[in-house]
């Protein structure tokens, strides 16, 4: 397996981009910088990376399960933020994997080049770089996304697709939930009543909680070397030799795991969108 280019960029790389200075592995064309949050525009207005737009996960997810919007709705949202398939999207958040969730949805939609600020907003602040306050800048909407959405449907699966994939020999279902969630001690969310986990799933060593997978990060919040996380997965017999479907509660932590596996060069990987939230409402089977 050949490792894919890492999606994570450091704060100084982004600062150089904003100052139009040369960078390693820079975007090949137009690029957009977006802060991703959930009901957090007030935090963005209080201080954000200069030039960043704000996009809320509620714009791309739908009730009642927080699954991704239908394709035409998603297309309209992305166009309104000036995004199209050939754009490079550089995303950051203030924790909780909102940026990873959005980045994965963008890949699914058809944007091939997504970058993630390693350590998010806090890494920008630690570096002592400038911030600006106020509302999001005026964005000129795009008229044509450039490809039909979803251009990569195999990356994000609904429940029926997940069940079909699991019927194929060798497919691994990997829970990116904490051990207390995986073992049925807690659901991990105040809006998910059921405890337990999907039968046959392997635990993805996701210690911590829904806001932070502690053993996937360094002490400063940046991402550990993917090879170190692969070694943790190996302990649970999770490798890229098999097709792998990641899931969590509603897709955010699973999206983070997806990007780790992608950086490792794992070829056949996907996220089950509905996760435990959906599965627990439609089946009686738990482990």
Regions found by a protein language model. Give the residues of each.
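Cytosolic catalytic domains that perform sulfur/thiol-centered chemistry
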Residues: 1-287
């Amino acid at each position: 397996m050949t490792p894919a280019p890492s999606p994570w960029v450091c704060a100084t790389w982004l600062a150089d981009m904003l100052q139009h200075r040369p960078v390693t592995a820079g975007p090949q064309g137009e690029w957009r910088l977006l802060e991703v949050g959930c009901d957090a525009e007030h935090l963005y207005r209080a201080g954000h990376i200069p030039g960043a737009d704000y996009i809320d996960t509620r714009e791309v997810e739908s009730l009642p399960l927080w699954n991704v919007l239908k394709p035409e709705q998603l297309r309209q949202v992305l166009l309104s933020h000036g995004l199209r398939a050939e754009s490079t999207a550089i995303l950051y958040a203030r924790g909780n994997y909102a940026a990873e969730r959005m980045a994965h949805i963008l890949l699914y939609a058809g944007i091939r080049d997504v970058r993630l600020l390693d350590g998010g907003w806090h890494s920008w602040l630690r570096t002592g770089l400038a911030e600006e306050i106020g509302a999001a800048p005026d964005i000129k909407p795009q008229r044509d996304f450039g490809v039909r959405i979803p251009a990569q449907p195999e990356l994000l699966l609904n429940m029926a697709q997940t069940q079909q994939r699991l019927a194929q020999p060798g497919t691994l279902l990997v829970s990116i939930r904490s051990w207390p969630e995986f073992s049925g001690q807690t659901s991990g969310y105040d809006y998910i009543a059921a405890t337990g986990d999907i039968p046959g799933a392997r635990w993805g060593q996701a210690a911590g909680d829904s806001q932070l997978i502690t053993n996937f990060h360094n002490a400063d919040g940046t991402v550990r070397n993917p090879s170190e996380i692969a070694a943790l997965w190996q302990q649970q017999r999770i490798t890229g030799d098999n097709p792998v479907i990641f899931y969590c509660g509603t897709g955010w932590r699973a999206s983070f795991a997806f990007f780790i596996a992608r950086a490792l060069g794992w070829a056949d990987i996907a996220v089950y969108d509905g996760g435990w939230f959906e599965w627990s409402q439609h089946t009686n089977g738990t482990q």
